[in-house]
């Protein structure tokens, strides 16, 4: 069954925790991104874990292998349940991330490692270099390389999930941002609705502003979960 991840893209812990309280019991996951993590540090992960959430730490690691290894080790020890890293970092970086996870987990499974292919805010016009076979082909190549390097899945548009599952296997996880009910797209380009994402095989759906910007965030989250399960 697909799971809802609420993106808590706030500038401070108080705002994020207040929103988390509103969706607690509806969404099993929250996402901590760059702004919140840089403002509050690893302690914010602990706060959400104490509230009963699983935590996706979305820092999009992309550096030399040894640096990524250390970052993943630290994030694992901080309690992250899922981490993101760029597929463009290549096999050595992916292997280093797995090593960091193993060291940080102390014999436990550790967090899921999800590779970023192409950001869902981007389309072909945003890529600053030629993509000869198109954006979809590039996403598939990055997904396959991530699978072969032993990562758990990819962060990808819902438009690409079916092709990725076909190429990498159904056990290769897909986490889909750019989820917009009623086709509200704002600054996301490659978007799908909750039901479309689930139908195409997404394992995790990341939703931010349609929930956090709603007059009643809990009800907005419930509607999305209902659509996911319909």
UniProtKB/Swiss-Prot annotation:
Substrate binds at residues 9, 31, 58-67, 120, 180, 188, 208-209. Keywords: Decarboxylase, Lyase, Pyrimidine biosynthesis. It comes from the Bacteria. One of its GO terms (cellular component) is cytosol. It catalyses: orotidine 5'-phosphate + H(+) = UMP + CO2. Gene3D superfamilies: Aldolase class I. Pathway: Pyrimidine metabolism; UMP biosynthesis via de novo pathway; UMP from orotate: step 2/2. PANTHER family: OROTIDINE 5'-PHOSPHATE DECARBOXYLASE. HAMAP family: OMPdecase_type1_B. Belongs to the OMP decarboxylase family. Type 1 subfamily. Homodimer. This is Orotidine 5'-phosphate decarboxylase. The gene is pyrF.
């Amino acid at each position: 069954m697909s799971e809802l991840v609420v993106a808590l893209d706030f500038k401070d812990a108080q705002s994020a925790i207040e929103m988390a309280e509103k969706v607690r019991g509806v969404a099993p996951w929250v996402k901590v991104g760059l702004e919140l993590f840089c403002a509050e540090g690893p302690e914010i992960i602990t706060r959400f874990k104490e509230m009963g959430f699983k935590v996706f730490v979305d820092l999009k690691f992309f550096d030399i292998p040894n640096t990524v290894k250390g970052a993943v080790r630290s994030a694992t020890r901080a309690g992250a349940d899922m981490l993101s890293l760029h597929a463009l970092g290549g096999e050595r970086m992916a292997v280093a991330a797995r090593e960091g996870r193993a060291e940080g987990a102390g014999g436990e499974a550790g967090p899921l490692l999800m590779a970023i292919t192409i950001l869902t805010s981007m389309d072909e016009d945003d890529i600053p270099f030629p993509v000869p076979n198109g954006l979809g082909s590039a996403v598939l190549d990055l997904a396959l390389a991530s699978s072969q390097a032993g990562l758990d899945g990819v962060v990808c548009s819902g438009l690409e999930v079916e092709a990725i599952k076909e190429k990498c296997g159904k056990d290769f996880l897909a986490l889909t941002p750019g989820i917009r009910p009623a086709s509200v797209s704002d600054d996301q380009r490659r978007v799908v609705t909750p039901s479309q994402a689930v139908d195409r095989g997404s394992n995790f759906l990341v939703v931010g502003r349609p929930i956090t910007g709603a007059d009643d965030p809990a009800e907005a989250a419930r509607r999305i979960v209902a659509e996911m399960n319909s």
